[in-house]
Amino acid sequence: MRTLIGCTLLIALAAAGGGYAYWTEQREVGHYLSDLRVELAINDGVDSGRGNLLGIEAQLSPRDYQSLALLHLKLAAYMSKARDAGLLNDKTIVVLPEHIGTWLMFRGEKNELYQARDLSEAMHWLAISNPLTFTRAWLGAVGESRLNDAHLRMKAASMAADYQTLFGGLAKEFGVTLVAGSIALPDPRIENGTLRAGTGPLYNSSVVFDRNGAAQGKPQRQLLPTYEEQTYIQPSPDHQLNVIDTPAGRLGILVGSDSWYPENYRSLNEQQAQFIAVPAFVTGKDTWQKPWGGYKSVSTPSEISLKPGEVSEGAAWHRLTLISSVPTSTADAGITVFSQGKFWNKHSGGQSFISRNGLTSHDMPVTSARLLNLWL
């Protein structure tokens, strides 16, 4: 009798395990009508043949990341609108928002994930739908928040490949230089024009693709991650900023709040950066209008007199972004690009702006995805 009961239990466990394994392999793409609307919010200057900076403030949601085809559909629609408006040429530098690549961790998942009530539940579905991958990632995780590290690390190889395919493909398809926002990857590197993920700490990095779709230079790692991300995103160990030669001129990149630090502009000055792209990200509903929280990750730079709560988050971004503010920055112009949208219960809502002659453009009401163009 005991033998019979034991065999029955083993059969039941095997059946349950087999059923679970089969369930984890099922991936059905749900029906989703993507919002492809985009408006030209700013068109500053005139075409002098020297190129332009074009920021795409994308409206994004988890459903856009069900497949590369869906995300390509949306981003290609934005870029097609820019091309139809005469804003794309062989000297155009397109800039996308920070973390647009990080969300690729949700590509190709089960419908339960996209239907989750909040981000925490979505992460739960991500883990249980990929049990072996998640377990390996958790065992190799580093930093204070191993869970967040594991969630980002578990699909790093496929995320890097997807990022290369999507953004390198868009750069080639439209014949532009593309600053592909940023992506969180372990020890990213570029080999023969292709982005690869490593096995070390996680870095929030931006990659530039040329008109042939090849990744250029080195991934620009964020020097000073935000206070909220520091438990799993590591600061760049070499504190190095890279300047890349493009058909329009020499381009520097400051990821997110790296644009708040005067010493970073001086570093770009030394490398004769002519333009600066800032892929950026702000979380929280109405955060842009709420009081600025100050420098949380490090001490306030001695040159900065702005105090926490003195102005709104949006006003702080405008004041602390020092592009073309001589003598701190000798760059000719720049652009700061945020995303709009909602990932479950997490909102993103910064307002993109352009910088020229030490001045920034004014905020405007956001009703859809936006294009911001700055002729050089």
Identify what each model region corresponds to.
Residues 48-68, 219-221, 249-258, 277:
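Active-site-proximal beta-strand elements of phosphoester/diester hydrolases
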Residues 67-81, 116, 128-131, 156-165, ...:
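Well-ordered, non-membrane alpha-helical segments in soluble/globular domains
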Residues 23-40:
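Alpha-helical transmembrane signal-anchor/signal-peptide segments
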Residues 164-165, 185-271, 288-292, 370-376:
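Active-site catalytic loop in hydrolytic enzyme cores
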Residues 4-20:
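Hydrophobic membrane-insertion alpha-helices, especially the h-region
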Residues 165-176, 256-372:
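CN hydrolase (nitrilase-like) catalytic-core segments centered on the catalytic cysteine
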Residues 73, 81-209:
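Cys-nucleophile CN-hydrolase/nitrilase-fold catalytic domain and related Cys-dependent amidase chemistry
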Residues 36-82, 90:
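N-terminal active-site segment of His-dependent metallophosphoesterases
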